[in-house]
Amino acid sequence: DITEIPTSDIADFDFLLAGFPCQPFSSAGLQLGFEDTRGTLFFEIERILQAKKPYGFLLENVEGLINHDGGRTLSVIVTHLKQLGYFVSYRLIDSQFFGLAQSRKRVYIVGTRDAYISLDNFDEHTVLLGDILESGLPVIDSPFTQKLFSHFTPEQVVGKAIKDKRGGEDNIHSWELGLKGETTQEQCDFLNLLLKERRKKKWAEEIGIDWMDGMPLTAKQISTFYSRENLQEFLDELVEMGYLTLEHPRKREKNRRIPDETKPKGYNIVAGKLSFEFTKILDPNALAPTLVAMDVSHLGIVDNGGLRRLSIREGQRLCGFPED
């Protein structure tokens, strides 16, 4: 724990390389910034710089640091570093322009004691995912991949996301694969319609709750855009199959959502993606998305007529490791 290490126990050094925790500023977190105890670890960097007085430093953090708290968080950081006697520069850099087949935006903050360091004079070049992929590797034969290729060809799944959270032509949904039980065309069409309809802000106004991306709708509300006989039984069958859930709308309470039991329950998509063996089939003619540790094992590559995960070597290339 760096907070418990006195600077007298740290050897002298010339350059500090540091990355303070990104969760307080990350779009994947709650973006609490310095309110988060992890966000205060920047001040440990300041403490060490003040005591050891190295020639320079290079700090790294996520894109969210730029605009967090209206830019005030970054301003505090830069001001504190300048007050220590450093010439400070910073820039948001995207790895896709520096030879990596991955879009990964990061803020770099650099400082030295005698000059500003330019972060605008790098040679830029791009590569695509296909440039770093291996071929002919073993593919995965599992119930999931068998289901996938019983409904789609390998060529059809390239570039597709597999999740039930949103719609669109680039998504494949669990009901289109029959993962929880084979569905009829009518059931598929309805679920695709509900997936889009539940996002409309008018439902939040009608229910009397802050809008959320995916409102649970009652059978009566659903009947206003989808009419059929025995609608209630139709919906309940999809609940029994596991494609729909019956739940209360969720009200906003501070930085999270909790069920509002004063509102009637409605039907909602059972959303999620990490429950799927694969959640994204990468396109070799494009870039990989920003890699997240918990998601990377769910990324798929079409290879040799089947589907496999990224190899270790491919993962290393995506992160900029040299071939040796």
Task: Give residue ranges: language-model regions.
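Extracellular/periplasmic catalytic domains that process cell-envelope and extracellular macromolecules
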Residues: 9-10, 101-103, 282-285
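Flexible, glycine-/basic-rich loop-and-beta segments that form/coincide
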Residues: 100-179, 185, 191-192
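Short catalytic/ligand-binding loop motif for oxyanion handling, primarily in non-cytosolic enzymes
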Residues: 23-27, 65-68, 99-102, 116-119, ...
